[in-house]
From Swiss-Prot:
Phylogenetic lineage: Eukaryota, Metazoa, Chordata, Craniata, Vertebrata
Description of how the protein assembles with itself and partners: Dimer of alpha and beta chains. A typical microtubule is a hollow water-filled tube with an outer diameter of 25 nm and an inner diameter of 15 nM. Alpha-beta heterodimers associate head-to-tail to form protofilaments running lengthwise along the microtubule wall with the beta-tubulin subunit facing the microtubule plus end conferring a structural polarity. Microtubules usually have 13 protofilaments but different protofilament numbers can be found in some organisms and specialized cells.
Biased segments, Acidic residues type: 429-449
Protein's organism: Gallus gallus (Chicken)
Protein name (record): Tubulin beta-4 chain
A biological process from GO: microtubule cytoskeleton organization
This protein's UniProt keywords: Cytoplasm, Cytoskeleton, GTP-binding, Isopeptide bond, Magnesium, Metal-binding, Microtubule, Nucleotide-binding, Phosphoprotein
Amino acid sequence: MREIVHIQAGQCGNQIGAKFWEVISDEHGIDPSGNYVGDSDLQLERISVYYNEASSHKYVPRAILVDLEPGTMDSVRSGAFGHLFRPDNFIFGQSGAGNNWAKGHYTEGAELVDSVLDVVRKECENCDCLQGFQLTHSLGGGTGSGMGTLLISKVREEYPDRIMNTFSVVPSPKVSDTVVEPYNATLSIHQLVENTDETYCIDNEALYDICFRTLKLATPTYGDLNHLVSATMSGVTTSLRFPGQLNADLRKLAVNMVPFPRLHFFMPGFAPLTRRGSQQYRALTVPELTQQMFDAKNMMAACDPRHGRYLTVATVFRGRMSMKEVDEQMLAIQSKNSSYFVEWIPNNVKVAVCDIPPRGLKMSSTFIGNSTAIQELFKRISEQFTAMFRRKAFLHWYTGEGMDEMEFTEAESNMNDLVSEYQQYQDATAEEEGEMYEDDEEESEQGAK
C-alpha cells in the first residue's frame, strides 16, 4: 500500500542513505538481518511503505544503491545493516566520476543508468500502488549530483505521475571537498528546479554550525553531520511511515507545501539537537520544542528564516503529548511572529503528531519550512559559480566530456531566476491584487466616457 522506492547515489548519498535505513529499521523493530523483533503493531501497520516483505518473512528495504566506484558501497555492505539490502540492488561502476558533474550526467553515469533503471522497474513492479521516489545525494560531487539528476529525469520520464522527492546535500565552503562544487551544484539545481516535486535542502554549512555551536564539538566529522541528517530524515518521513492523518503521503505533503511548482526547496529543522551517543536525558516540553524548532540555529540549511518569509510550514511532533498544547503553541508562535508568514496564504502551517518518539528521546519535533530565505543558499552558490565561470576556470574538465558552455550559462540564469522568484513572493502582499483591480476599473471608466 502506497510504497516509496528509495534511491541513493554517490558517496554522500550512500552514507546518509545507509544511516537513514539504520535509524528507521530501528524505529520499526527490524534487526540487521531483516527480522521483525519489535513489540508494537504501529511499527508494522505501514511498514510496506519502505519495506518489502520477502517470502521468508524478512523485511527488505525498497532501496537501490548506486555509485560510479565500488568503495562506499563496499563499506555499506560490510556495515551493520549491510545484509538488510537486496544484493541485486547494489549497482556500481569502476571508474568513478572524479567530482565531475559531466561524467556523472553524460559519460560514465549514462553508461550505468540503464542497469539502474532495470532495478528501479523491478522494485516498482513489486509495489501495490507506488506513490513515488526519494533520492539521497549531494550536489557537490560528480555521481550524486550528475548521475543523481540523470536518474531523476529518466525516472520522471517513465513514471511522470509519481512524486519525486530528494534529500539533497548542498555544498558549503566551510566543509568543502572540491573546488568545483559550485559548478556541480548549479548544474544540479538547474535540474532539480524542473524535475522534482519536493527537495529537502540539507546544508553542510548549517550542519557544521550546529555541531560546532550547539553541540560543542570541536572537530565535527562527517559521522556527526550524518547523525543530524538521519534524525531529520527520520523526522520528515514519520508521517509517511506511521499511521496518521496529516501529510500521510508524498503527494499530500506536496499539495500542502508547494504553492508554485518551482518553489519546492524546503528548509528542514529538528529539535532537540543532541550529540551522537549522548541523547538528552531531560524531558523537553512542547513549548521548548516549538521554540527550538523555529529557531534559526536549528535549521539544516544555512539560511536565516528571519531574512525571509514562510510560504508554508509543516511540522511533525513525536512522542506522547497533548494535541491541545501542540495546537496552542503553534498558534502562539504564528501570532507572535505573524510578519514572518505570508498573509496571502491563510492557515499555512500544518501540524502532525505521531505517538512513537525516535530512539533515546521522549519527544522530538521536526520542521519543514518553505521559506523565501532559502534564496540565500542559492545566492551563495551563485556567487561562487560566477567568480570561477567569469574566468572559465576548470571548464575544460566539463567541455572535455562533451558539455557546452551554454549549459553553464543556462544553469546560472535558471538559478538566478529562482532567486528572483523567491524575492518576488517575499515582497508580495495581500493588498496588491486589490489595488490593481481598482486601477483597471478607473481606466475602463475613463474609456467609457
